[in-house]
Amino acid sequence: MTNNNNRCVVTGLGLINAIGNNVNECWNNALNSVTGIKNTTTVDTKDCYATLAAEVNYKDLDSIPNTANLDRVTKLCIKATLEALDDAKLSSFGGSTRVSVIMGSCVGGAVSIDHYYRNDKPASDVCKMPISAIASSVAEYVKAGGVVTNIANACAAGTISIAYACDLIRAGKADIVIAGGADAFASVPYSGFLALHALDSNPCSPFNKCSGITLGEGSGAVIVESYEHALKRNAKVYCEVLGSGVSSDAHHITAPREDGEGQMNAINWAIKTSGVAKNEIGYINAHGTGTAKNDNAEFLSLHTIFDNENDNLSVSSTKAMVGHCLGAAGAIEAVFAIKALTTNKVPATLGYDNDDLVRLAEKAGKIDFIPNKSKDKELNTVMSNSFAFGGNNASIIFSKEAGDVKTTNDNGKVYVTGFGIVTPFGNGVDTYINNINNNVKPESNSIHSSVVADEYAKYGQKPTYRKHDNLSQLQVLSGMQALENANITVTDENATTIGIVEGTADGAMGTCLQFTENIVEKGCANGSAFKFPNTVYNAAGGYLSICTGIKGYNVTVTNGSQSGLQSVAYATNIIRQGKEKVVLATGTDENIEAINEVYGKLNVISNDVALPFEGKNGFTLSDGSITIVLENDKDANARGAKKYAEVLGYGMATSAVPFGTVKGSDKGLDEAIKLALADANLTIDDIDTISGFACGLKTIDDIELNSYKRIFGDSLNNKNLIEVKDHVGEARAAAASLSLAHAALMLSGDIKSDNGYKLSNGNVTKTVIESKNLKNVLCVAYAAGGTYTAIVITK
């Protein structure tokens, strides 16, 4: 049986979608087989072959207090969150670092992106656009002060968010996590799926007609709580959250593997980590999109795993009622699965006529796909599955029993064993070290990285170069470099033991902006089938998986610039908990024309070159991709890997302020540093060097300096300060990752010295930092909205 410290329980539910504005309304309509699919009137449908959508009908959405400046997707998320908190008898958390927010999304603020191009590009739309804004705004609304991030793995995002919530609780990093997902119906996904000919002109018919999807919108929120915390406050408990599985197909950016390998890996890992038998699972809320490739692969996966193992399995897809809600789908379907479990009723899959039922009987075997009408069924354990663009797969299990989850947090030390470095001043570790030796610095206020086909050709990937967007090119090259630098070859034998955690501030927003500008000009019927797959934030991580053959954990996190360091914290947790042996943790952002434009609207790009501590009103906008290879000590030792540094501990905290600002969020950095030191079992006196995030913008630089003064006091006079943005500008998530990569290269002696800073009596002075004097380095990163990550590494 699961130990109490590993038990995660659900204590609150929130839901809004096309068949209801709260959990009870949605559930009652689901049991009555009500569909919310109708003709849409909210997007341009001229010359479009499909005009259906499952849209939310909640007239008071724009009346939720203090949400006037938020995108529709964030309003949907806050609506579901508030219901879940009320259900759990919880409210505002006073900034507690024990309360976290993890939200999934696919297209983020796509409604605001559309509005931007249709209304003369107002600056007020910019901070509503990124996926980053969602969880950050929820955290501000409920005053959560713990780990705050968004999972951007397209249609698997909502499921992975709940899985990560449990990982944080089992790691001792949180007592309560508000987890879920949200997406709004908008012209970008509508036009994109039209371009792929993936929409059905009729209501979608999962596991049946399989002629396309119908898009939906909404949000699902789940309050995940440690069992002991819930017990202490005498909370109502819906169910236990047992194990989960997250995998990558390494196959195709939009289509699943026909053999279902990746799906089956995720499902089997969820079962194994739950400690349940296959025949204990009574109901599965399937991904079931209504496309032939997806449904056929899922059919195969379910039959392969459960035939001859479970003769009492029921499966349904609720997408026939609520549509495909993209990043919200996994969260919405998790709520449906939990309601099925707790009410002993299973919702139907709609759309079968008599002839369809004959065909279903031929291919369903002993699996009951619950056609057309819901049914009563005694349930003890249920599963929810989500599969996504990029080849991402996620499965999670809920139960009335505690299961046998055996997560540990002590699977050995975690080492840095390799790097891939792509910056505006060249690509590769050796190039970067040479640039540091020559003290290379930015020479303009906006700079960008580039990748050429020959760099792909070195790794046998030249044919794929032109298929990848700019962001993906940066990520794929740095990822392939990192594997080479770490001397790791991906094989069929080790592919599932290697994972990817991509961190990004803005992700694919640049491509999304380009895609939207085109359809605003030419109409939704003329979206680009070539560009659309690259509008999802996890495309870069998906392409990296495809090019390298990595089939393990694959997740994209996004919450501002600190995402590049947050990815290292997430990856460290994955290795500590024994989910993978090796994880590529990345920080990647691009500076294409569209991105430069929207940052210009915010007036944060300096008029000239801006370097740390120059007290300017802007920064040098930059980009790049940094991949850091993390590995457990046992496997690193076994293969004789070079160890650049050891990850001792990490901390993540939030002092939430309106997204797009940092002013007033100082406490968040203080708390992140304290948590990192505690996790590393070190004191302030053990830290000799800090690798910071100063960029030249005075507001940001002052937060960093003032926090150091509060945390370190007089001992600050003895500490060195590395600022990588001296060399690469404000590269956002790439700079956050680089802060750790640079420090690790100094700890290993690969970088002998660097021009850095000293803080003496409150004043910043320049100095030369010798690597031979370094032992313990504190790396820190910030995000607009007030989230901070701190990580301690050592020799």
Identify the function of each model-found stretch.
Residues M1-N66, E228-E240, V335-L350, A394-T464, ...:
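ACP-dependent fatty acid/polyketide chain-elongation machinery
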Residues M1-V10, F93-S96, V276-E280, F306-D311, ...:
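Flexible, low-complexity linker/loop segments at domain and module junctions
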Residues R7-T11, L31-T40, P203-S274, Y283, ...:
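Condensing-enzyme catalytic core mediating Claisen C-C bond formation in acyl metabolism
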Residues V9-V10, V34-N150, F185-Y190, K278-N294, ...:
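Conserved beta-ketoacyl condensing-enzyme motif
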Residues A18, S63-L82, N119, A123-P130, ...:
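Active-site pocket-shaping loop/turn-to-helix segments
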Residues L31, N39, K121-S124, I160-A163, ...:
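Glycine-/small-residue-rich "gating" segment that lines the acyl/pantetheine channel
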Residues C77-D87, V142, G146-G181, T214-A235, ...:
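Active-site-proximal alpha-helical scaffold in enzymes
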Residues K173-S211, S244-E258, A286-D295, N310-I367, ...:
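Acyl-CoA/ACP chain-elongation machinery
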